A protein has these predicted regions:
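Hydrophobic packing positions in regular secondary-structure scaffolds
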Residues: 1-174
Length: 174
C-alpha cells in the first residue's frame, strides 16, 4: 500500500501501539528493511516505547554500528537534549570548499535527517554552521571557514530539554 521509500517516514509518525503491533507482525526481512530506512532518533523513540522482547528483536535486526549508536543515544538522561537530538546531519570541515560541500551533500544527504543546516566540526567540536542556501548561492571556491556563522547558540547533550526549549523560544529558533 505504501511505497517502500515512504514506509519509514509513515511508520515514524504512527502512535506507539500501532508501531508495536507492526513490529510484532513484520517478517525479519520486513523489519530489517524498515530499520535500515528509519532515522536513528526515530529508532530510539520506538525502542523507548516497546516491551523488552520487541526491543531485543529490533536490536537483533540492526547492524552492530547502528546498534552501538542506538545504545549511545539510549544512555542519555530521558529529559536531556541528547535524548532528542539527531545524530544524522551533514558535517563538514573548515577547509572544505563550497563545491566539495555540495558534492558531499549529494553523496551522503539521502542518509541524513537534516541537510538544511550543515555543521562545521573539528575534533568533534562545533566551530560553526552554514545553511544549504549559503552553499547554493556562494562561489564554489569559498571555504566553510570563510562562510560559516560562528556566533551560534549551542547546548550540551546533558542540558535539560526545558532549558533547550527556553533557548529556542528566546532566540526564535522555531
Amino acid at each position: 500500500l505504501i511505497p517502500k521509500s515512504k514506509a519509514a517516514d509513515v511508520f515514524a509518525e504512527m502512535n506507539s501501539s500501532m508501531q508495536s503491533y507492526l513490529v510484532k507482525i513484520f517478517t525479519e526481512d520486513e523489519l530489517k528493511d524498515l530499520l535500515n530506512e528509519l532515522f536513528l532518533d526515530d529508532t530510539v523513540d520506538l525502542l523507548e516505547d516497546l516491551p523488552a522482547n520487541l526491543v531485543t528483536r529490533i536490536l537483533e535486526n540492526v547492524d552492530s554500528e547502528k546498534r552501538n549508536r542506538i545504545n549511545q543515544l539510549l544512555n542519555y538522561p530521558e529529559d536531556s537534549a541528547g535524548s532528542v537530538m539527531t545524530t544524522e546531519y551533514v558535517d563538514l570541515r573548515k577547509h572544505t570548499t563550497v563545491q566539495e560541500a555540495l558534492a558531499h551533500i549529494k553523496q551522503t544527504g539521502i542518509h541524513k535527517e537534516t541537510i538544511y543546516t550543515c555543521y562545521i566540526l573539528e575534533n568533534r567540536r562545533l566551530l560553526g554552521i552554514v545553511t544549504a542556501k549559503d552553499l547554493m548561492t556562494m562561489d564554489d571556491d569559498l571555504t566553510m571557514e570563510e562562510l560559516m556563522e560562528t556566533e551560534i547558540i549551542s547546548v550540551s547533550t546533558h542540558t535539560d530539554q526545558e532549558e533547550v526549549g527556553r533557548l529556542f523560544s528566546k532566540y526564535g529558533l522555531l
